[in-house]
């Protein structure tokens, strides 16, 4: 019975995925994922990424956000990406594969970044979901805390940050933490984010150091 339910749920997800206009649009445009449209909407509203900037992309694979960011920063900019999963090379993107919770990987990433000279930290990280809402929420909040900690280590004064957060336990506390670290914090729900998803994006500007 459980398997049948799971199978029906998987079929529904696959149908929804392949009928999704953003999935179709991403394929037509040669983009790596539909997630790029979320960043594109954030960029249209908030203009976080500018030519010549240095951007760090956490949880980058398969590379949709990095693919978009590298076009925005141009030849004089720099995109540094990190993910536990492998990612096909992208021109202009400096990719490090590994789990930055591990000290050696974190050190290698910080070495690539080279100090507090980052203009934008962005994170579309999400844990592998188990279906246990309490455990999944705790894991997702742990990841967003890690991305905020990365901001504290690498962002320059007045730098910016955008991060995917799932509404639920711990959200309000995290929102307040971000508010304490940045001058302005906004919550965005891009049109390309599925309506039934609890995900939202925090967009924070004016890092206080």
Curated annotation (Swiss-Prot):
Gene3D superfamilies for the chain: Vaccinia Virus protein VP39 (3.40.50.150)
Record-listed E.C. numbers: 2.1.1.166
Cellular localization per UniProt: Cytoplasm
Recorded catalytic activity of this chain's protein: uridine(2552) in 23S rRNA + S-adenosyl-L-methionine = 2'-O-methyluridine(2552) in 23S rRNA + S-adenosyl-L-homocysteine + H(+)
InterPro entries (UniProt xref): RNA_methyltr_RlmE, RNA_MeTrfase_FtsJ_dom, rRNA-MeTfrase_E, SAM-dependent_MTases_sf
GO MF annotation, one: rRNA (uridine-2'-O-)-methyltransferase activity
Disulphide bridges: none
GO cellular component, one term: cytoplasm
Keyword terms: Cytoplasm, Methyltransferase, rRNA processing, S-adenosyl-L-methionine, Transferase
Pfam families: FtsJ
Keyword Nucleotide-binding set for record: no
Binding site for S-adenosyl-L-methionine: 63, 65, 83, 99, 124
Domain of life (superkingdom): Bacteria
Family: Belongs to the class I-like SAM-binding methyltransferase superfamily. RNA methyltransferase RlmE family.
Chain's role: Specifically methylates the uridine in position 2552 of 23S rRNA at the 2'-O position of the ribose in the fully assembled 50S ribosomal subunit.
Annotated protein name in UniProt: Ribosomal RNA large subunit methyltransferase E
UniProt source species: Pseudoalteromonas atlantica (strain T6c / ATCC BAA-1087)
This protein's encoding gene: rlmE
